[in-house]
Amino acid sequence: MATYGQPCARPMCIPPSYADLGKAARDIFNKGFGFGLVKLDVKTKSCSGVEFSTSGSSNTDTGKVTGTLETKYKWCEYGLTFTEKWNTDNTLGTEIAIEDQICQGLKLTFDTTFSPNTGKKSGKIKSSYKRECINLGCDVDFDFAGPAIHGSAVFGYEGWLAGYQMTFDSAKSKLTRNNFAVGYRTGDFQLHTNVNDGTEFGGSIYQKVCEDLDTSVNLAWTSGTNCTRFGIAAKYQLDPTASISAKVNNSSLIGVGYTQTLRPGVKLTLSALVDGKSINAGGHKLGLALELEA
């Protein structure tokens, strides 16, 4: 489940959103790795408070280069956030969010995208409401065939969490997504289980073994198949500026990552993916990422 602060002294606190259930375990598997990519991320902030984020990556297998540019401005007095996005597919995006103004805990977001090359447009209205013991979300994705409604709810009490997520496609007049999740968390241990559409079953465990070592286990199984997916991952903080990550799954894919803070605002990540079943056959992947922030 998600890391969202230490447990409350009171029996009630704000649970994470449905998308963030199990996030602590997923982060151990995903962060610190970038197989098959050479990536550069740059973040900076102007004197007027405008935040700029640029990202570029090159796929070492295909040679394809992709990039994104994002600008964000927060008008704190009115709880407004304006975001502009662009990517190398020439898709433009605009997002306007207002939070804690209509009522405490309510956030409304208006999100639009436009592709000049194809003329394709999309729009989405997103809302979330979080208070003690509850976190609700409802998004409406507009489409010419008919809007799709995405809803989610998470309830929490004394460390226990229960969540539900659905998608209703008005064009087909039926539910296209129907997910359930149950979990439990304490300060250094988190357990999460989920059922997606009644066919996919999954679970994850996050454990902070000590101050410098985090571990994670995940398991997934799809009904109607004999395929079970299993993985173990760990992250160890070597010192305040360096960490090493490792993971392995039941397909004998072994991933290793090393992250080093070269100086404040400059972070380098090196990673490698090795196929344990065919070590001498090649096909292994390397990754390099550099993050700059000022």
From Swiss-Prot:
The keyword Secreted does not apply. The modification Phosphoserine is found at residue 251. It is found in: Mitochondrion outer membrane; Membrane. The modification N-acetylalanine is found at residue 2. The keyword Mitochondrion applies. NAD(+) binds at residues 253-255, 271-275. PROSITE patterns: EUKARYOTIC_PORIN (PS00558). It catalyses: chloride(in) = chloride(out); K(+)(in) = K(+)(out); a 1,2-diacyl-sn-glycero-3-phospho-L-serine(in) = a 1,2-diacyl-sn-glycero-3-phospho-L-serine(out); a 1,2-diacyl-sn-glycero-3-phosphocholine(in) = a 1,2-diacyl-sn-glycero-3-phosphocholine(out). Consists mainly of a membrane-spanning beta-barrel formed by 19 beta-strands. Non-selective voltage-gated ion channel that mediates the transport of anions and cations through the mitochondrion outer membrane and plasma membrane. The channel adopts an open conformation at zero mV and a closed conformation at both positive and negative potentials. There are two populations of channels; the main that functions in a lower open-state conductance with lower ion selectivity, that switch, in a voltage-dependent manner, from the open to a low-conducting 'closed' state and the other that has a normal ion selectivity in the typical high conductance, 'open' state. Monomer, homodimer and higher order oligomers; formation of higher order structures is necessary for scramblase activity. Interacts with ARMC12 in a TBC1D21-dependent manner. Interacts with KLC3. Interacts with SPATA33. Interacts with PPP3CC in a SPATA33-dependent manner. This is Non-selective voltage-gated ion channel VDAC2. The lineage of its organism: Eukaryota, Metazoa, Chordata, Craniata, Vertebrata.
